[in-house]
């Protein structure tokens, strides 16, 4: 809505921006895994929260199509480093018998945030305008980083490999593992369809049904709330 309404981009240009968003997320996820192995999950989580806070503040000053594509790619390349590091951290902050439950609670927290975020975003846009979102996004990222720093204890050492983990010699190359590649392809197809809702559904609500930002945010938030339930 911001790209078409405030920046005046065409639907095709919005598609390219979302592609840059996805590519940045892909790079960030890969880099987050690498950094978690190199420097540990804790600093990776911390800086992948604080740094995007600054980048979101700066994003509001980008006013060109190409500039926004590059900027959103950089933002997501840093922000999505958090995901793999966060999942690695579960081994340090949860017991083996609670690991599955821990992943479930993480997913519940994500969906609860997804239900509150769009609703709050629609309200903020209605009251303060689009540019205020950049400040709110940046501030929440920075606050999340401070929560990690102040309330999440840094482990004395990275969690050791599982006792029953197979030796490296017998681990399969993921690119030669047929069932795993099939699973990845299935995840790709699911994401290919589902993630279009972030770009197309808000425009559909606005252009076809004439809804304003606040009810659009409430409808998108309802989706996350139902998944949470």
What does each model-found stretch correspond to?
Residues 22-26, 30, 114-115, 224-228:
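Residue-level signature of mid-helix packing/kink "hotspots" within the transmembrane helices
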């Amino acid at each position: 809505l911001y790209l078409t309404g405030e920046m005046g981009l065409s639907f095709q240009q919005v598609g390219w921006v979302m592609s840059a968003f996805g590519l940045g997320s892909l790079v960030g996820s890969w880099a987050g895994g690498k950094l978690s192995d190199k420097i540990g999950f804790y600093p990776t989580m911390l800086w992948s929260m604080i740094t995007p806070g600054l980048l979101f503040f700066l994003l509001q000053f980008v006013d060109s199509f190409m500039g926004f594509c590059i900027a959103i790619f950089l933002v997501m390349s840093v922000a999505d480093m958090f995901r793999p590091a966060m999942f690695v951290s579960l081994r340090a902050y949860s017991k083996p018998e609670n690991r599955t439950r821990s992943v479930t609670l993480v997913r519940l927290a994500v969906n609860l945030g997804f239900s509150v975020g769009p609703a709050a975003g629609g309200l903020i846009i209605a009251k303060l305008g689009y540019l205020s979102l950049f400040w709110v996004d940046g501030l929440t990222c920075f606050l999340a980083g401070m929560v990690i720093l102040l309330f999440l204890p840094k482990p004395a050492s990275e969690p050791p490999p599982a006792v029953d983990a197979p030796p490296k010699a017998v681990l399969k190359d993921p690119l030669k593992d047929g069932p795993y590649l099939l699973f990845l392809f299935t995840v790709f197809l699911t994401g290919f369809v589902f993630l279009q809702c972030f770009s197309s559904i808000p425009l559909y609500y606005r252009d076809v049904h004439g809804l304003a930002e606040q009810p659009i945010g409430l409808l998108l938030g309802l989706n996350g709330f139902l998944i949470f339930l």
